[in-house]
Curated annotation (Swiss-Prot):
PANTHER family: ALPHA- 1,3 -FUCOSYLTRANSFERASE, ALPHA-(1,3)-FUCOSYLTRANSFERASE 10. The keyword Endoplasmic reticulum applies. It comes from the Eukaryota. Protein O-fucosyltransferase that specifically catalyzes O-fucosylation of serine or threonine residues in EMI domains of target proteins, such as MMRN1, MMRN2 and EMID1. Attaches fucose through an O-glycosidic linkage. O-fucosylation of EMI domain-containing proteins may be required for facilitating protein folding and secretion. May also show alpha-(1,3)-fucosyltransferase activity toward the innermost N-acetyl glucosamine (GlcNAc) residue in biantennary N-glycan acceptors. However, this was tested with a library of synthetic substrates and this activity is unsure in vivo. It is found in: Endoplasmic reticulum membrane. Disulfide bonds join C389-C392. Glycans are attached at N110, N168. It is a single-pass type II membrane protein. This is GDP-fucose protein O-fucosyltransferase 3. The chain crosses the membrane at residues 9-31. One of its GO terms (molecular function) is peptide-O-fucosyltransferase activity.
Length: 479
């Protein structure tokens, strides 16, 4: 009987808590809605747009967390909640009161809150960051934060100091950012140790009668890393099975040709049969490490890696991948792979860590243990939630400093938060290397122009006035 009464009491408390939270959230929405309607009529956005933009669809797979339990001890007032305005309509949320630990912030994509006195931070999605409309003039209490987990080729302007230092807070693939996303494609240590897809070496040796030692799967051809040129040259020295649109010489089953099938069990089973995989990133940047590296490690295939110069900091063990950068020419790389292919003892040295389930890299272990978000884990926040809460928490910290009469802490991004060298192209044999295509040429010229764009944008933002695209491009091509 006592247990039943306790359960009833607990249920009653939960109902009361939920009711209070719903009422508070509703009141916030009503009050902000009044402001929104007022601003909708008299908005002075620089581009003249007052209509809310649609959210992009490429991140729809990330589930947003709902508003969490409201702290009833804090006296509710509309002015109690800093507004975090997504200037890029990434989340698609017109308004949500989100709890971040002991703090709460109002998150929205609605630009009519630009002039609200409680708007404290503007959140940008790196790929969508452009000069068409920026929240200018920028007030002293307006923080800017950028979230950029995608390829550098999507927006080169961000990779130059004049632009990246416009932001107060960053979430990027760099370990140096305020919220590092370096391991964004790695679910957990357990998936690295898993033997689920591992094909025994004896079986792989038998499969070699019909399979090449190397496999290559890419459909994004001629990216800034110029990987296709390298692989094309490599193919003249060793057999490579290429399944993607780039350099294709082998076909996947029809049901696996869709790019969405790259994480399908059937695709994994095919790739796991190979001894080696060419894991080439589409761009060369410190800490830019994608599924191209982690996938083969999960499947028990040795990655032949080209991409992040800092990849050795993230290897599960010292001998878990073959690094292209250690070979002066594809011919030498091919010779080394043939040697491993013919010597089981040498090959097994690269998968020993997986067979034993031993990961010796403490940096990797620490990064996964301490990151504040999860990958495909319903029990953890995703990295967008973590980014929002990072900004919310830092904004609140400064509010509390000011309440004590102290100056707020000034946060600023550094150029190390996104670091990529200028793209280069491979040039091996003049007879086999194709002439520079328009796409291959584009990455180099685009990077060069982005330097001028970054300088022009910085000058205009520092001027702190609205500007037109004509004014921007006039500065870019001034010389």
């Amino acid at each position: 009987m006592v247990r039943i009464q306790r359960r009833k009491l607990l249920a009653s408390c939960l109902c009361v808590t939920a009711t209070v939270f719903l009422l508070v959230t509703l009141q916030v929405m009503v009050e902000l809605g009044k402001f929104e309607r007022k601003e909708f009529k008299s908005s002075s956005l620089q581009d003249g747009h007052t209509k809310m933009e649609e959210a992009p669809t490429h991140l729809n797979s990330f589930l947003k967390k709902e508003g969490l339990t409201f702290n009833r001890k804090r006296k509710w007032e509309l002015d109690s909640y800093p507004i975090m305005l997504w200037w890029s309509p990434l989340t698609g949320e017109t308004g949500r009161l989100g709890q971040c630990g002991a703090d709460a912030c109002f998150f929205t994509i609605n630009r009519t809150y630009l002039h609200h006195h409680m708007t404290k931070a503007f959140l940008f999605y790196g790929t969508d960051f452009n000069i068409d409309s920026l929240p200018l003039p920028r007030k002293a209490h307006h923080d800017w934060a950028v979230f950029h987990e995608e390829s550098p080729k999507n927006n080169y302007k961000l990779f130059h100091k004049p632009v990246i230092t416009l932001f107060n807070y960053t979430a990027t693939f760099s370990r140096h950012s305020h919220l590092p996303l370096t391991t964004q494609y790695l679910e957990s240590i357990e998936v690295l140790k898993s033997l689920r897809y591992l094909v025994p070496l004896q079986s792989k040796n038998k499969l070699r009668k019909r399979l090449a030692p190397l496999v290559y799967v890419q459909s994004d051809c001629d990216p800034p890393s110029d990987r296709d040129s390298y692989v094309r040259e490599l193919m003249t020295y060793i057999e490579v099975d290429s399944y993607g649109e780039c350099l294709r010489n082998k076909d996947l089953p029809q049901q696996l040709k869709n790019p969405a099938s790259m994480d399908a069990d059937g695709f994994y089973r095919i790739i796991a049969q190979y001894k080696f995989i060419l894991a080439f990133e589409n761009a060369v940047c410190d800490d830019y490490i994608t599924e191209k590296f982690w996938r083969p490690l999960k499947l028990g295939v040795v990655p032949v890696y080209y991409g992040s110069p800092s990849i050795t900091d993230w290897l599960p063990s010292n001998k878990s991948a073959i690094l292209v950068s250690e070979f002066s020419h594809p011919r030498e790389l091919a010779s080394y792979i043939r040697r491993l292919d013919s010597d089981d003892r040498l090959y097994e040295a690269y998968v020993e860590w997986k067979l034993k389930g031993e990961i010796s890299n403490q940096r990797l272990l620490t990064a996964l243990r301490e990151r504040k978000w999860g990958v495909q884990d319903v029990n953890q926040d995703n990295y967008i939630d973590a980014f929002e809460c990072m900004v919310c928490t830092k904004v609140w910290a400064n509010i509390r400093l000011q309440e004590k009469g102290l100056p707020p802490k000034r946060w600023e991004a550094e150029d190390t938060h996104l670091s990529c060298p200028e793209p280069t192209v491979f040039a091996f044999s003049p007879l086999r290397t194709p002439p520079l295509s328009s796409l291959r040429e584009m990455w180099i010229s685009s990077f060069e122009q982005s330097k001028k764009e970054a300088q022009a944008l910085r000058w205009l933002v520092d001027r702190n006035q609205n500007f037109s695209s004509q004014e921007f491009w006039g500065l870019v091509f001034k010389d």
